[in-house]
């Protein structure tokens, strides 16, 4: 009797889960209607995995309608994930003109300084882009920064519109380079003090631009609107920049958000993940919920050689490493 009751209870739970994931799948397409729906767009891989599991379960239970529903919506999510499928990380044959960018969100709460130093030393990037650079991090990495002859740091407020009771920290966005550069923009958005930094670099008589970004996290309507305005400002900067372009950093948005899709379309940049893998980067401490919110985007005249995540260094984000050359 107890086993029958337990089985019936489990069936009910799985049906409720099926209903919930189907609803989340549908609402994820309505991100422009409400900021909460936009959050629902980010977990396509998780929806696909959950629905596939439920479909297999309902096959065993011979519940064909629920099986069809689970696999139908699993297919919907799979179609969105598929363009990012792949395990090959070499895109084009490397050559003597290869440039390497390392992008790291340090996480101001993270104190694993030696681990971060090891990532930077091992990667040996031509250009290092850092987000959430605090006073503590600045002091701990000072000798590493001294190895880069060209650098810029920009203070910004990552706590825009956070509640007053939350302790605030002074954070910076930084670009450190072995290649000479000139600053082309250090922008504070008019309604929001979250910056991006743009620099124009020169490598073997070829010029290209790098933008380092840390967009506002979409925690509420106001912050979501701020992030979306920042995406629009970036489009403007890209359109007026007549150079091969790379944008790296923490975008706080996944490829499945309608706002990200609009950004890619308007900027005409290429998503370096496509065809290589989803490569989720955050939150590193909760692996089943990890989503790709750190990005490396390039213009069509950038030849990508490889796109990889770097190793864990204690942050809630994993770093990104791009190797490329200028066409």
For each of these PLM feature ranges, what is it?
Residues 1-7:
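Short, Lys/Arg-rich, polar N-terminal cytosolic tail immediately upstream
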Residues 9-17, 66-69:
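Membrane-interfacial loop-to-transmembrane alpha-helix junctions, especially the N-terminal start
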Residues 101, 107-121, 130-327:
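Soluble catalytic domains of enzymes that build or remodel membrane lipids, polysaccharides, and related
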Residues 12-57:
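Membrane-embedded alpha-helical segments of integral membrane proteins
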Residues 37-38, 64-70:
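Short, aromatic-rich membrane-interface segments at the entry and exit
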Residues 55-65:
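Juxtamembrane helix-break-helix junctions at the cytosolic face
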Residues 60, 68-122:
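N-terminal signal-anchor transmembrane helix
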């Amino acid at each position: 009797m107890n086993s029958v009751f337990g089985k019936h209870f489990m069936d009910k739970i799985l049906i409720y889960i099926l209903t919930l994931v189907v609803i989340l799948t549908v609402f994820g397409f309505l991100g422009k209607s409400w900021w909460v729906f936009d959050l629902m767009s980010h977990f396509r891989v998780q929806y696909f995995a959950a629905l596939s599991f439920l479909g297999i379960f309902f096959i065993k239970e011979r519940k064909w309608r629920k099986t069809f529903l689970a696999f139908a919506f699993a297919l919907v999510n799979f179609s969105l994930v598929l363009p990012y499928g792949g395990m090959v990380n070499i895109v084009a044959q490397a050559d003597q003109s290869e440039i390497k960018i390392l992008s790291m969100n340090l996480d101001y709460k993270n104190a694993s300084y030696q681990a971060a130093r090891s990532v930077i030393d091992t990667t040996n990037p031509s250009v290092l882009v850092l987000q959430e650079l605090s006073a503590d991090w600045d002091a701990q990495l000072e000798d590493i920064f001294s190895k880069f002859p060209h650098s810029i740091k920009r203070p910004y407020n990552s706590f825009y519109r956070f509640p007053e009771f939350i302790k605030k920290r002074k954070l910076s966005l930084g670009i450190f380079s072995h290649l000479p550069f000139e600053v082309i923009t250090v922008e504070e958005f008019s309604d929001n003090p979250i910056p991006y930094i743009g620099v124009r670099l020169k490598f073997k008589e070829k010029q290209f631009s790098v933008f380092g970004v840390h967009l506002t996290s979409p925690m509420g309507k106001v912050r979501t609107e701020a992030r979306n305005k920042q995406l629009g400002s970036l489009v403007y900067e890209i359109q007026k920049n007549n150079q091969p372009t790379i944008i790296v950093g923490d975008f706080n948005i996944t490829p499945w958000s309608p706002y990200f899709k609009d950004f890619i379309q308007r900027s005409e940049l290429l998503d370096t993940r496509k065809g290589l893998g989803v490569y989720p980067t955050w939150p590193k401490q909760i692996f089943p919920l990890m989503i790709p919110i750190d990005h490396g985007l390039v213009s069509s005249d950038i030849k990508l050689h490889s796109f990889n995540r770097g190793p864990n260094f204690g942050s809630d984000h994993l770093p990104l490493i791009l190797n490329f050359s200028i066409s």
